[in-house]
Amino acid sequence: MAIKVRLAPSPTGKLHIGTARTALFNWLFARKNNGSFLIRIEDTDKERSQEEYKENILEGLDWLGLTWDAEPIIQSNRIEQHREAIKYLLEKGLAYRCFTTEEELAAMREEQKSRNKPPRYDNRHRSLSTEEESNFLSEGRTAVIRFRIDDNESIQWNDLVRGPMNWTGKDLGGDMVIARRAPANEIGDPLYNLVVVIDDGYMGITHVIRGEDHIANTAKQILLYKALGLTLPKFAHTPLILNAEGKKLSKRDGVTSISDFKEMGYTSKAMSNYMTLLGWSIPDGMDEKFTIEESSKVFDFDRVNKAGAKFDWEKLKWLNSQTIHDSSSEEILKAVEPLFNKEGWDLPNLEWSLKLIELIKPSMTLLTDSVEQSRFFFEDPLLNQDAINQLEIEGAKDSLKILLKQIDTSKINKLTVEHAKKLINDAAVFGGFKKGLIMKSLRAALLGCLQGPDVINSWILLSEINQDKSRIERCL
C-alpha cells in the first residue's frame, strides 16, 4: 500500500512554526517510505480564511523545501460531498437534528459547573418524538446536526508516537455537532471533525501525523470513520513546541511564523534542521547539523519524543550561523542581494560581490547581518569616537600621508594582499612607524571604526571601486 500523508492548514493566519514542523515530519515520513506528501487547504471558516494566508502557507512550505506531490485540495470546493455524508448519517439514524437553543446550552453548562461537572451535552434531543420535533419546528427553531456517541463505546488505536491509546465515548462530551445551526429543513455548514474524515478518505490518506492537541479529535474521528465505512488510517501525535516557560508556543511569545523567521535572516536549511530537532532525536553517530534530504533517510517515529519540545533561540542561531558559514558565497549572495537592493545599493560586479561575501560571511549569524557588515562598502562611514581617537594619536595621520604617497608612486593597477602588505611595510620603514599604527589608522579611515572585517581585504574591495584614497584623504 502506497503511503500518503497530508498537511491540512487553515488559511486564517501565516504559516506557524508548529504547522511547519508538522509539515516537515509528514514530508520526512513520506520521503523515507517513498510515499506522497499532499496538501489540503481547510478554508471552511469563511470569515477568517484569506487568500493571502493561503499564499503565505504555500510559499513558506516551498521556501523550506517541503515540496508537495499533487495540486492542493481546497476543502470548500467539496462542501456538497460533506453534506452528502451527513445525509447518509441522518438516514442511517447515526445522526440527528438537535433543536437545543444557545440559551439552553448555556444554562446546561452553568448547571454542570455548579455541580463541579465537566461541560458536556446531555443528549436531550437524541430521541425526540415526532410530536416534539413538530413543536420545535412550529416554534421556528433552528437545528444543528449531532452524531450519536455511545458513552460505552470503546475507542482504541495504536499511536505511532504514544503507543496504545484507550478512550471511551463518555470522554467526548456527549453527541458531537457535525453541522452548524441552520433552518431545520437544511443542513448547515459541515464542521471540522466530519469534513476531515471525509476528505482524508477521499484523498486516500494512510497516516495522519499531527500535534498532540488533536488526540481528542482523533477519538471522535475514529467513530466517524467507522460509521461512514471508511478505511481507518494510522495516527501519530507529535509533541507540541513549547516556550521557555513550558507552555505551548503562541503569538504572544513573539515571532512564530515562518515568513517572520525568514525576514529576520534565518536560512531555510537552518529552520528545517532545527525544526526536525524539535521533538526528534537523531540516531547515534549522526551530526545534529544536517539537511532534510539526510534526515529523510533515517526519520522514523521511534525517535519522536512524547514530551513537548522547548524552543531554544540560541540553538537556532547557532545552527543558522553554521549553515551560513558552510554555504557557498554564491548561495549567500543570492540570499542577501534583495536586502542590498532594499538599501538602494548597487553591486559593481559578480567577482567583487563574491569577495565581499567571503569577507563578511565568517562573522554572520543571520543573513540580515550582511547589511550592517557591508554598509562600509556602499556608504561613506561616519567616524565613531574610537576611530577619531585613533587618528588623533601622534603619527597616525602622518603615517597615512606616507601610505598615500606609496599608493600614488606604486602605480599598481589592481591591489592584492601582497601589494597591500608591501605598501604598509614600505610606509612603516620610510616613515619610521610601527605597522600596527598604520593598520589601525587605515581601518579607522576606511571603515570609520576599529572593529569589523579584515582591514587588508576591506582595503582591496574599496580600492576596486575607487573608494580607498578618498576615504584616507578626508581624514588628513
From Swiss-Prot:
Its EC number is 6.1.1.17. Signal peptide: none annotated. InterPro entries: aa-tRNA-synth_I_cd-bd, aa-tRNA-synth_I_codon-bd_sub2, aa-tRNA-synth_I_CS, aa_tRNA-synth_I_cd-bd_sf, Glu-tRNA-ligase_bac/mito, Glu-tRNA-synth_I_codon-bd_sub1, Glu/Gln-tRNA-synth, Glu/Gln-tRNA-synth_Ib_cat-dom. A motif ('HIGH' region) lies at residues 9-19. It catalyses: tRNA(Glu) + L-glutamate + ATP = L-glutamyl-tRNA(Glu) + AMP + diphosphate. It holds the Pfam family tRNA-synt_1c. GO terms for molecular function: ATP binding; glutamate-tRNA ligase activity; tRNA binding; zinc ion binding. CDD domains: GluRS_core. ATP binds at K251. It comes from the Bacteria. Residues 109-133 are annotated as: Disordered. Its main location: cytoplasm. GO terms for cellular component: cytosol. Gene3D superfamilies: 1.10.10.350, Glutamate-tRNA synthetase, class I, anticodon-binding domain 1, Glutamyl-trna Synthetase, Domain 2, Glutamyl-tRNA Synthetase, Domain 3, HUPs. Monomer. Belongs to the class-I aminoacyl-tRNA synthetase family. Glutamate--tRNA ligase type 1 subfamily. This is Glutamate--tRNA ligase. It comes from Prochlorococcus marinus (strain MIT 9211). The lineage of its organism: Bacteria, Bacillati, Cyanobacteriota, Cyanophyceae, Synechococcales. The gene is gltX.
